[in-house]
Regions:
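Flavin (primarily FAD) binding-site architecture
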Residues: 183-203
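Active-site/ligand-binding neighborhood in enzyme catalytic cores
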Residues: 56-157, 165-167, 186-188, 196
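A short alpha-helix-loop-beta-strand transition element characteristic
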Residues: 2-19, 84-91, 229-235
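Central beta-strand plus flanking loop segment that forms part of the substrate or channel wall
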Residues: 204-230
């Protein structure tokens, strides 16, 4: 609202049709199954209100959070008597949210995300995926730059940050040195160790960057012929290379779906193979192309969105955003609330 950046609804996140693969069979979710579908999430997250009563203030229930810290999503799923539909819906959705296998994903981190949206499935879906910037994230960046009068240097990597009594000296790969009284560090957690800090960062920050968060996988955009409608697909990674997808942009001649995959090399997968995969969910669909960016191999990210590993919250959550002399740490990867989201980066 501050900048008047236009937003629009993502069609598939208000889906008219949900195709869900349970085992080796694809079914269209029926109206009489919606209660069962949503109830699976309420069962999985039944403890979240007590554990994350105030999701923007983890100190409020820190003991309860730390008590669950070592648990994985797989641990929680195995403890519940969910129906096959619920197990696929919850498991698949959380594979997308964590961008990793349930055995590697943190139960605490998933509860945090659920609590941020008021323990409500509809708000969870709307907040996490339903709305997007009409002109992309770049429109927001441009508005912030114009408002603040900043100078932006693209394709300019930082190799070192040296602190002195008077401030900081930031050196880029091309040898340019920028001197300032303070530095706000928004480098993603997974590449923080690629910058040489003098004096060195705390041992905990170095440990966290070396360990890395669990966010991996691939976001694969799929261009299809015609208009498939406002559709969503859902599966488990053990049952399909496509754990989920939704209509991202509709058009009469061609449309685009946003898909998610944990399969290695998903972006290099031949179009013919993706055709077979998607047609299982949407019979008759014809793929035109696939595209996306490999954030895992990108030297400036080395991963997708951030969620901490099981058992690391208690060690990392207070230390990662703690300032060190003239360096202040304020990335989405260290945000107290919307960690891993653009809201966390802004906050």
């Amino acid at each position: 609202e501050r900048y008047g950046v236009e937003i629009q609804e993502t069609p598939g996140c208000a889906a008219e049709r949900i195709a869900i693969k349970i085992g080796d069979q694809v079914h269209d979710l029926q109206d009489n199954q919606l209660t069962e579908f949503v109830d699976g999430f309420h069962q999985f997250f039944a403890e979240s209100k007590a554990v994350w009563e105030l999701p923007y203030n983890s100190h409020h229930t820190r003991d309860a959070i730390v008590e669950c810290d070592a648990l994985t999503v797989a641990d929680r799923l195995n403890a519940l008597q969910l129906t096959p539909l619920q197990r696929t819906a919850v498991g698949g959705m959380l594979e997308i949210l964590s961008m990793n296998q349930p055995a590697n994903a943190s139960y605490v981190e998933m509860m945090r995300c659920w609590s941020l949206t008021g323990w409500n499935y509809e708000l969870f879906n709307d907040t996490a995926a339903r709305y997007k910037f009409t002109d992309g994230t770049g429109a927001l960046v441009d508005a912030i730059v114009q408002d603040g009068g900043f100078e932006v240097a693209l394709n300019t990597s930082v190799v070192s940050v040296q602190q002195t009594a008077n401030g900081v000296s930031v050196t880029t790969t091309n040898g340019e040195v920028v001197n300032a009284k303070r530095a706000v560090v928004t480098v993603p957690l997974n590449v923080l160790n690629s910058v040489a800090f003098d004096p060195p960062l705390s041992s905990v920050k170095q440990e966290a960057s070396a360990l890395k968060h669990v966010g991996g996988g691939y976001k694969v955009f799929i261009e299809v012929d015609g208009d498939p409608g406002a559709v969503m697909t859902l599966s488990r990674s053990t049952d399909s290379p496509l754990i989920g997808s939704f209509t991202y942009k509709r058009g009469q001649k061609h449309s685009v779906l946003a898909g998610f995959s944990l399969e290695p090399g998903a972006l290099e997968k031949p179009l013919s193979e993706w055709q077979t995969v998607l047609e299982e969910f949407l019979p008759g669909v014809r793929l035109l192309s696939t595209f996306g960016h490999d954030w895992g191999v990108d030297a400036l990210s080395q991963g997708s969105w951030c969620t901490y590993r099981p058992g690391t919250f208690g060690r990392f959550v207070d230390e990662l955003p703690r300032h060190e002399d003239h360096c202040f740490f304020a990335s989405a990867d260290t945000s107290e609330g919307w960690r891993g989201f653009i809201e966390g980066a802004i906050a």
